[in-house]
């Protein structure tokens, strides 16, 4: 488990480890249940306090993933969440995801900063070799965001997830740790 006082700081936002506090729980529930966030997740059922706390215990606090609350630098206001899930220490990889829960914060370049800070943690602190992301094909903004930050498309997954009675396509993108990218001579 991460030190609860840890901060990964950028220009506009910083990341701090999620806690099981009432504030973090209420924010996650509100954000994940909002119509601007929920449609972009595979798990579409309403989030509950009990379900969220179980997730924290079984996944985050058990070391199977890392989840951060994203806060504004200027006033410490929580505005979203970022995470690395399905952490595989042997293969040194994890799945990346994030969301900005506060609508007013969208369109300010914060998503790009969150991605950069999360990759800094993944590659420099966890020493991951690879980070991947599965994104619904009908979410071009997220695909564009990760692609602009060094993620490359590895697969287009047709009818990958059955969500709300409809099969949806997904795009699998990944980024190799820049410190480990092989040159042509090394291949």
Q: Where does each model-flagged region fall?
A:
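Conserved GNAT-fold acetyl-CoA-binding loop/helix
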Residues: 36-54
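DNA-binding alpha-helical recognition surfaces that contact promoter or target DNA
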Residues: 30, 54, 144, 148
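Generic structural signal for secondary-structure transition and capping sites
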Residues: 36-37, 64-65, 127
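A short helix-loop-beta-strand connector motif used in the catalytic cores of GNAT acetyltransferases and
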Residues: 57-69
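An amphipathic alpha-helix signature
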Residues: 22-29, 49, 53, 57
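Acyl-donor (CoA/ACP) binding surface of acyl/acetyltransferases
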Residues: 1-25, 67, 71-187
């Amino acid at each position: 488990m991460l030190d609860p006082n840890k901060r990964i700081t950028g220009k506009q936002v910083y990341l701090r480890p999620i806690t099981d506090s009432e504030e973090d729980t209420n924010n996650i529930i509100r954000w994940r249940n909002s119509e601007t966030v929920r449609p972009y997740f595979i798990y579409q059922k309403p989030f509950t306090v009990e379900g969220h706390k179980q997730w924290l215990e079984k996944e985050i606090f058990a070391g199977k993933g890392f989840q951060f609350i994203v806060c504004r630098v200027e006033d410490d206001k929580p505005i979203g969440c970022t995470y690395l899930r399905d952490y595989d220490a042997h293969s040194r990889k994890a799945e990346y995801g994030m969301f900005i829960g506060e609508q007013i914060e969208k369109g300010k370049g914060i998503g790009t900063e969150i991605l950069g800070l999360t990759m800094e943690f993944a590659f420099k602190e966890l020493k991951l070799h690879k980070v991947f992301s599965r994104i619904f094909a009908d979410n071009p903004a997220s695909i564009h965001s990760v692609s602009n930050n060094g993620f490359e498309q590895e697969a287009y997954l047709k009818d990958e997830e059955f969500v709300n009675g409809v099969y949806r396509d997904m795009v699998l993108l990944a980024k190799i740790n820049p410190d480990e990218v092989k040159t042509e001579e090394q291949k």
